[in-house]
Design a protein with these regions (language model features):
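Residues forming the flavin
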Residues: 1-253
Length: 253
């Protein structure tokens, strides 16, 4: 399956075209392993290179929030984002009804993944929702702003309806998730409604949101700040995206 749906791909074609016509040299598949003001150390086309620059714009993107929990290193336990990429690129998740998948966490990525799993015929034993009702109430105050981007709201509603039609059991207010098994995942244990429950599963896909990927900027000792609401560290930038390190700016997450 394609990584983007046709509408998303079409929306990005204009940006790609303008970039291709800008005169910038494009090196796909490059690995950056060193960064300092005015210099980038990397591997391009299998060769180590050092590039000099008057200014560097870093776009490290985001990553899934790491969520350690009992049994999280067992084979069969992985992040939802990684599982979605595997599913769409190679269809590696089993559609065997005797090898059910459990989703755990909260956020729109789980909606997207659940839809892709259902399309691929992968059975979903349950969705363990770890979201807090208090946060949902807080988010409700932002709903009127949705009228400014109705296509995006419609996309979210479409994903939610797909899960409802698939009759995925959604268990709310889940806490204390544990992955249990000897040499691979055998069941998922969790608390909900004041009781402990368990579900047989061969795969557990956990997701608790996206956070900025800060590794390369931390290596530069760039100034970061803690977001107490989103609960992550992020680079401190000015209105033009400049970081606290001279000659280094950031774009995106």
């Amino acid at each position: 399956q394609a990584l983007l749906d046709p509408k998303e791909r079409s929306a990005g074609l204009g940006l790609v075209k303008r970039f291709r016509e800008s005169g910038a040299t494009y090196y796909p598949g490059t690995t950056v392993w060193g960064l300092e003001p005015h210099r980038v150390s990397c591997t391009m086309n299998g060769k180590a290179e050092e590039l000099a620059a008057s200014h560097i714009i870093v776009a490290p993107g985001g990553m899934e929030r790491p969520v350690p929990f009992p049994g999280w290193t067992l084979p069969g336990v992985m992040g939802a984002g990684g599982a979605d990429i595997l599913l769409r690129s190679g269809g590696t998740l089993s559609a065997d009804k005797n090898a059910p998948v459990v989703l755990a966490g909260n956020g729109p990525l789980l909606l997207l993944l659940a839809g892709h799993l259902l399309e691929a015929g992968v059975p979903i034993a349950a969705w363990l929702d770890t979201g807090w009702w208090s946060r949902r109430i807080m988010a409700g105050a932002l709903m009127p702003a949705g009228v400014l981007d109705m296509p995006y709201v419609a996309k979210g509603m479409k994903m939610a309806l797909r899960v409802l039609k698939g009759k995925v059991p959604i268990i709310r207010n889940v806490t204390n998730i544990r992955a249990v098994g000897s040499d691979h995942l055998e069941k998922v244990v969790y608390d909900a409604g004041g009781k402990t429950h368990e579900i047989n599963a061969s795969t557990l896909l956990r997701h608790e949101g996206i956070i900025p990927r800060t590794h390369i900027l931390n290596s530069l000792n760039a100034k970061h700040a803690w977001d107490g609401v989103q609960r992550y560290w992020h680079p401190v930038v000015d209105e033009n995206g400049r970081t606290s390190v001279d000659g280094i700016s950031i774009a995106g997450d």
